[in-house]
């Protein structure tokens, strides 16, 4: 008489059939794989900017965002107009080409969006927002947070930083399929010289204290529509810090009209008030190798064996 498997036997066997646990690697925020970064508005290499997020409304990319921990992303207030319904937003993480989602990319709803109270319209102060993901993510090489600067992290004028996004390559154009993430190196410009450029036809101050500019006097290279809310990251001691949030500009890549960003360092207290356990400066994290940020689970062979055992009961 042959032996029979009971449900209790199967339950006892399953833990033995688990995939080897992925215990993760201890690392820090603001780290990306070694990639060649090309100056001048080019396709970003895979894995170059793992904190880049696509904010989508009704399945259409509208803004960028930056992953800052397992649950929160940083973006621009104008990406969340008052009439918009939160349930129609999705955050896409770990993706380089929006038209062809890569294995390991995530598409998550938002559970909360919070714009700063100072924001009153295009070009105003306070164009910064926080959005909470529908569930926490597990960090993988494709999905990692940028570092938030602390009070001691400063980036002087002339610092070469990078802006990334899926925005228009030129004003009025759409990024063609497969909608590959774009990257551009830009030098920082202090608010006062930048304001002087923008005030040539106006006596009113345009660049406020919570803003920073980045770009080139000759134009031709800049962030544009669709890049809004995305990260301006600068490197310090080998780590990438989110220094700015793409906010506004006059046209796209026009001479003497650099891009204008909200300076993240001006809103550290606000971020700390609304993001539980927000951490600034260098933060240690654990990165897992599993795609999609999922926890370790049964190996495929284990699932097949369990199904076979159930059939012969």
Where are these regions (language model features)?
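Extracellular trypsin-like serine protease catalytic domains
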Residues: 34, 38, 52-58, 164, ...
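Active-site substrate-binding loop(s) of clan PA
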Residues: 117-120, 136-185
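Short, charged beta-turn/beta-strand-edge "cap" motif at the junction between a beta-strand
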Residues: 20, 79-81, 167-169
């Amino acid at each position: 008489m042959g032996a029979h498997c009971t449900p209790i036997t199967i339950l006892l066997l399953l833990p033995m059939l688990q995939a080897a646990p992925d215990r993760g690697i201890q690392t820090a925020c603001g780290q990306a794989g070694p990639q060649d970064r090309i100056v001048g508005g080019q396709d970003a290499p895979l894995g170059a900017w793992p904190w880049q997020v696509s904010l989508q409304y009704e399945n259409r990319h509208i803004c960028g965002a930056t992953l800052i921990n397992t649950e929160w992303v940083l973006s621009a207030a104008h990406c969340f107009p008052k009439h918009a319904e939160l349930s129609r937003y999705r955050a896409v993480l770990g993706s380089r080409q929006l038209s062809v989602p890569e294995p390991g990319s995530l598409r998550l709803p938002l559970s909360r969006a919070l714009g700063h109270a100072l924001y009153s319209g295009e070009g105003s102060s306070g164009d910064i927002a926080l959005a909470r993901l529908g569930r926490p993510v597990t960090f993988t090489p494709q999905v990692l947070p940028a570092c938030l600067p602390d009070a001691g992290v400063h980036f002087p004028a002339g610092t070469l930083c990078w802006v990334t996004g899926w925005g228009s390559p030129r004003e009025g154009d759409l990024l063609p399929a497969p909608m590959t993430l774009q990257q551009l190196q830009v030098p920082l410009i202090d608010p006062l010289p930048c304001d002087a450029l923008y005030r040539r036809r106006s006596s009113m101050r345009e660049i406020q204290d919570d803003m920073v500019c980045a770009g080139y006097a000759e134009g031709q290279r800049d962030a544009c529509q669709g890049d809004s809310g995305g990260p301006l990251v600068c490197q310090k001691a080998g780590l990438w810090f989110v220094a700015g949030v793409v906010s506004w500009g006059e046209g796209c890549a026009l001479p003497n009209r650099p891009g204008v960003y909200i300076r993240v360092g001006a809103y550290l207290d606000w971020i700390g008030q609304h993001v539980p356990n927000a951490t600034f400066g260098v933060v240690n994290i654990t990165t897992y190798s599993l795609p999609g940020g999922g926890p370790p689970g049964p190996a495929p062979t284990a699932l097949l064996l369990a199904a076979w055992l159930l059939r012969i009961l």
